[in-house]
């Protein structure tokens, strides 16, 4: 007895698109349409293109002391955030019995401490 396996439909190899197929004339025109206005603006307004120059002044410098007093290491905001993390972690652990929620506050506290150090608070 001869057994024949058959597959429904016609099987044809799927052609993969090459990397260079993305560089069509239409895509290049779209890119030019997006880049040319920005280049023209930079040509006519070079001070906007070089806005990160060294001649600028920091307009937010006057608020540094307020931010450090509100969100600094010894501020009450950070203490309340850590307390809220502990309470939410404990409640979530009681509800789900998942240890990840219980240890989550320690991980978030580390992220807050590292973030404060990176920002400079």
Curated annotation (Swiss-Prot):
The modification N-acetylalanine is found at residue 52. Keywords: Acetylation, Cell inner membrane, Cell membrane, Conjugation, Membrane, Plasmid, Secreted, Transmembrane, Transmembrane helix. Residues 1-51 form a propeptide. Residues 97-100 are cytoplasmic. Propilin is the precursor of the pilus subunit, pilin, that forms conjugative pili, the filamentous surface appendages required for cell-to-cell contact during the earlier stages of bacterial conjugation, and that retract after contact is established. Mature pilin is assembled with the help of TraQ and TraX. Belongs to the TraA family. This is Pilin. The gene is traA.
């Amino acid at each position: 007895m001869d057994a024949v396996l058959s597959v429904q439909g016609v099987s044809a190899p799927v052609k993969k698109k090459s990397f260079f197929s993305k560089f069509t004339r239409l895509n290049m025109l779209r890119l030019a349409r997006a880049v040319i206005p920005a280049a023209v603006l930079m040509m006519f307004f070079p001070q906007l293109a070089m806005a990160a120059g060294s001649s600028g002044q920091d307009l937010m410098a006057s608020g540094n002391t307020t931010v450090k007093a509100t969100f600094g290491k010894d501020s009450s905001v950070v203490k309340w955030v850590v307390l809220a993390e502990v309470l939410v972690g404990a409640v979530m652990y009681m509800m789900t019995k998942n240890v990840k929620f219980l240890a989550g506050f320690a991980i978030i506290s580390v992220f807050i401490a590292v973030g404060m150090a990176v920002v400079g608070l």
